[in-house]
């Protein structure tokens, strides 16, 4: 049997929390045509003359709040996960990390796999729910870099794992461990948002309030539907009553209509309607990052408290949890 490569792709982060490094990262990220779907002549001035100069100083301060000794949280947890995964997979796979908008790059990871002499490469976008802006964009980047490097090893793609038993099971375990002996009035599942225009590309999406719960091929391929499927699987495993949990979408950018309800609005409403003790779970992220630790862990808590909330619990992402490492190894071997 030939040697196999496994390429773990995540978005990455700035090299440091210095403003210039944050500017560079934001520019690379937002100039991706799958992230901001405008023609280049419109996207370039929007990103580099408007968004980045305004957001970079603010974002740099937020990165500083959550920065770890070894680097940004997403980079640290991704490296740890990859190292443990390599131990678990032993010589069945050569595991490498490629970050879309920072180092180590997808190109450098593919070079390493090429030099290792692998016969095929499984590309694993580390985003549980499928979206063109994440899974689609990362695989296209891998294809472009493979072509540039004249790779002979074929690329295969790991499907979205929004309903994978080990991903759901590890998430449930982390909820139980975090909230042991704690009183919780409501569980909020906060997923990364998308512009509605991205979701409407799937026929039938957002046509009715319950379209994401319909059992059809369209819902099966819809990011929003996959978010609800993940939340439902976790909630049911925790035996939560439907009235005790809800879904919201975070990290909106710009003036376009994004998926609703917004997480900050949901936190405000929950506090104002008497939910004193809440838990927030972020299952569109496999690694804690600025969006979970700062936006939700710090900013979300402030919003909740400002409107009358009391206890606020943030459940960690699956990160490098041993149960998740084992489960992901099993998933990879099954492909």
Curated annotation (Swiss-Prot):
EC number: 4.98.1.1
Pathway in which the depicted protein is active: Porphyrin-containing compound metabolism; protoheme biosynthesis; protoheme from protoporphyrin-IX: step 1/1
Record carries keyword ATP-binding: no
Gene Ontology annotations for the cellular component aspect, listed alphabetically: cytoplasm
CDD domains to which the protein is assigned, alphabetical: Ferrochelatase_C, Ferrochelatase_N
Keywords from the UniProt entry: Cytoplasm, Heme biosynthesis, Iron, Lyase, Metal-binding, Porphyrin biosynthesis
SUPFAM superfamilies, alphabetized: Chelatase
Superkingdom in the source lineage: Bacteria
Residues that coordinate or bind Fe cation: 192, 291
GO biological process terms, semicolon-separated: heme biosynthetic process
Annotated GO MF terms: ferrochelatase activity; metal ion binding
Catalytic reaction list: heme b + 2 H(+) = protoporphyrin IX + Fe(2+)
Cellular compartments annotated: Cytoplasm
Task performed by this protein: Catalyzes the ferrous insertion into protoporphyrin IX.
Name recorded for this polypeptide: Ferrochelatase
Source organism of this protein record: Bdellovibrio bacteriovorus (strain ATCC 15356 / DSM 50701 / NCIMB 9529 / HD100)
């Amino acid at each position: 049997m030939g040697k196999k490569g496994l390429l773990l792709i995540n978005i990455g982060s700035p090299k440091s929390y210095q403003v210039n490094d944050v500017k560079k990262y934001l520019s690379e990220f937002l100039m991706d045509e799958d992230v901001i779907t405008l023609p280049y002549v419109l996207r370039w001035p929007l990103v580099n003359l408007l968004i980045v100069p305004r957001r970079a100083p603010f974002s740099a301060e937020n990165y500083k709040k959550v920065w770890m000794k070894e680097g940004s949280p997403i980079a640290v947890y991704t490296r740890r996960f990859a190292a443990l995964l390599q131990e678990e997979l032993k010589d069945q796979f050569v595991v490498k990390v490629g970050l879309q908008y920072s180092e180590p790059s997808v190109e450098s990871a593919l070079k390493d796999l090429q030099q290792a002499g692998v016969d095929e490469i499984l590309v694993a976008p580390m985003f549980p729910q499928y979206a063109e802006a994440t899974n689609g964009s990362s695989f296209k980047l891998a294809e472009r870099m493979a072509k540039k490097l004249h790779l002979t090893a074929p690329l295969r793609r790991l499907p979205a794992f929004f309903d994978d038993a080990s991903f759901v099971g590890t998430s449930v375990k982390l909820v139980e461990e975090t909230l042991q002996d704690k009183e919780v009035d409501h569980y909020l599942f906060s997923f990364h948002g998308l512009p509605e225009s991205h979701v409407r590309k799937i026929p039938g999406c957002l046509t009715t309030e319950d379209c994401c719960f319909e059992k059809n091929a369209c819902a099966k391929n819809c990011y929003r539907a996959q978010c609800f499927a993940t939340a439902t699987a976790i909630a049911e495993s925790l035996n939560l009553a439907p009235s005790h949990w809800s879904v919201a979408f975070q990290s909106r950018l710009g003036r376009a209509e994004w998926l609703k309800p917004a997480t900050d609005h949901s936190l405000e409403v929950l506090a104002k309607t008497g939910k004193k003790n809440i838990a927030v779970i972020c299952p569109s992220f496999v690694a804690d990052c600025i969006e979970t630790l700062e936006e939700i862990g710090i900013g979300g808590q402030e919003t909740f408290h400002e409107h009358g909330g009391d206890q606020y619990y943030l459940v960690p992402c699956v990160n490098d949890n041993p149960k998740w490492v084992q489960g992901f190894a099993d998933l990879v071997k099954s492909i």
